[in-house]
Amino acid sequence: MAENQINSPEITEPSPKVQKLDHPENGNVPFFRVKKLSENAVLPSRASSLAAGYDLSSAAETKVPARGKALVPTDLSIAVPQGTYARIAPRSGLAWKYSIDVGAGVIDADYRGPVGVVLFNHSEVDFEVKVGDRIAQLIVQKIVTPEVEQVDDLDSTVRGSGGFGSTGV
């Protein structure tokens, strides 16, 4: 907490009343704010007007070892609108062509630190990431955060407690 106070002149917590993005105030969609932390940082961008995700780019050369993982810096900090979170997802081309996947990709609306991307290499060959390579996509999604209620029993369903594979393979 003390570290946040050093970096920020004023710390503000989000209001408990969350703005609904399907009914934005004054007809405006809230901003997705981005801070570049270095000259190598590339602002997130959408490849087409209907793209769900904003491409994230590497800010440093990184090797993802065969059958291994690496944390690739973007040198960006972000602020997504209240009532949303950002999810880091794989790029389909990297997954299909090079067996590169993304892990651990949830960014909460109150996180202001640097964004890094965990890349997993499922191939037998090292994967080289260059500065500026598009490595993942960031998808801003609405969230629902209901209150937690402890109960003695849950309602019955047809599926019941059937777990992995219980509805077919």
Curated annotation (Swiss-Prot):
Tissue: Vegetative and floral merismatic cells and provascular and vascular merismatic derivatives.
Pfam families in alphabetical order: dUTPase
Polar residues bias spans: 1-10
Keyword Hydrolase: yes
Domain of life (superkingdom): Eukaryota
InterPro entries xref list: dUTPase (IPR008181), dUTPase-like (IPR029054), dUTPase-like_sf (IPR036157), dUTPase_trimeric (IPR033704)
Keywords for this protein: Hydrolase, Magnesium, Metal-binding, Nucleotide metabolism
Catalytic activity: dUTP + H2O = dUMP + diphosphate + H(+)
Annotated region (Disordered), positions in chain: 1-25
One MF annotation (Gene Ontology) recorded for this entry: magnesium ion binding
Residues at which substrate binds: R91, S92, G93, G105, V106, I107, D108, G116, R159, F164, G165
Subunit structure of this chain's protein: Homodimer.
Purpose: This enzyme is involved in nucleotide metabolism: it produces dUMP, the immediate precursor of thymidine nucleotides and it decreases the intracellular concentration of dUTP so that uracil cannot be incorporated into DNA. It may have as well a metabolic role in merismatic cells.
Family according to the record: Belongs to the dUTPase family.
Protein name: Deoxyuridine 5'-triphosphate nucleotidohydrolase
